[in-house]
Amino acid sequence: MYLNNKNIKLPEDPDTIVWKYLDLSKFLDLLMSKKLFMSRSDKFEDQYEGTFSEPTYEEIKRIAENNPEFLQYYKSHREKVAVSSWHINEYESFAMWQIFTQNSEGLAIQSTIGRLQNAVIPEKKYDQYIGEVNYIDYKKEHIPFE
């Protein structure tokens, strides 16, 4: 079961359509393992994806002046976060096909937020969240953290 978090927004309508774009090898892995592949957030191609904005990082550094372990915790946090990215849209997206499939070989899985919520099997070792990514200006905007 996924957990709720006040800082992680989720569309209210459980029938919100989501898409997962996969190349053939990732789809075959899904079929054989019966598990979704989760990417570590420190392995994303986009260097800003899954990181703190500059204003937030500066705040973390100030807090860490008297507690160096605090900064190290936040730096290592990306290695411990795994993500399965889905795209919210009523229709397929040509851009998503281009990004997530190789050599025009791949497929798209259509589901809904509600079906994903019901499909998440409780994990005892890890906290699980489902939420919508909020893209921001990483140079200017502050990201709340606890």
Predicted regions and their residues:
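Partner-binding and oligomerization surfaces adjacent to conserved cores of proteins
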Residues: M1-E146
